[in-house]
């Protein structure tokens, strides 16, 4: 009821998370403005303007930590972004910030390694935060393999996806996502669809789909998109056309706040 109907589900969920944190007594809430993650690679308008959106719809008092990341602009790199994150707490020592950044990257890289090995998302995240690096292979034999194409916030948010991976596994389906692929494989997938990257996180959609469409071990593909997402609708159109060329079955699922099991 706080945002207009056309707002996509992930942003509505974010607004709900902010309200939930405020109700729990959290005073400082991280609401970044991610403009661009690489030169000329942009986010959607809702993510770029997220702090303004939250400021206008959430009227309860709290302190918003709102750093800006815009790698299309000079002087707006990662360390400047991190400085803006911690400056409100009186931390301005760049050496301290860089040291913390390197520690964070190690944890993130370990998480990526475990995820690519096939470890479930939550388990990989828990291990990484605990400082562990474990390689786990799923030895279960599945009669069917599909590629689940979407963004992490759609796949791994249980309310948004309704535990779609668990449901598919119970049906005897092996699930592959973008997060088992390397950056090189995702870039190869984007190229195979005959397009260039313009949107942030586009590789999760077109890169993932393009790579798995050529993979003979993949029997079919499921895409999950949020209703009202403009960038995803453009990417999905290209994926749908290419799936017909590769003769791969494709199921398009669109989710919103009314989605039920």
Give, region by region, the residue ranges found by the protein language model.
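An N-terminal assembly and electron-transfer interface module characteristic of large anaerobic redox
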Residues: 1-261
């Amino acid at each position: 009821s706080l945002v207009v109907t056309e707002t996509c589900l992930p942003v509505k969920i974010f607004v709900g998370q902010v309200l939930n944190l405020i109700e729990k007594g959290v005073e400082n809430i991280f609401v970044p403005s991610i403009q661009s993650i690489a030169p000329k690679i942009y986010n959607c308008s809702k993510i770029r303007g997220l702090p303004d959106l939250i400021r206008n719809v959430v009227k309860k008092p709290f302190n918003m930590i709102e750093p800006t990341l815009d790698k299309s602009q000079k002087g707006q790199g990662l360390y400047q972004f991190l400085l803006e994150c911690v400056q409100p707490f009186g931390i301005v020592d760049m050496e301290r910030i860089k040291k913390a950044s390197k520690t964070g990257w190690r944890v993130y890289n370990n998480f990526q390694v475990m995820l690519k090995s096939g470890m479930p998302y939550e388990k990989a995240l828990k291990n990484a935060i605990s400082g562990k690096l474990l390689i786990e292979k799923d030895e279960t034999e599945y009669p069917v393999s599909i590629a689940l194409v979407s963004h992490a916030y759609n796949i791994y948010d249980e309310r948004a996806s309704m535990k779609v991976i668990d449901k598919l596994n119970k049906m005897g389906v092996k699930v592959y996502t973008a997060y088992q692929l390397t950056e090189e494989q995702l870039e190869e997938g984007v190229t195979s669809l005959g397009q260039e990257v313009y949107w942030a996180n586009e590789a999760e959609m077109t890169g993932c789909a393009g790579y798995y469409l050529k993979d003979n071990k993949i029997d079919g593909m499921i895409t999950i998109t949020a209703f009202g997402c403009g960038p995803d609708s453009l990417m999905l159109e290209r994926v749908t056309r290419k799936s017909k060329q590769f003769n791969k079955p494709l199921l398009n699922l669109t989710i919103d706040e009314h989605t039920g099991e």
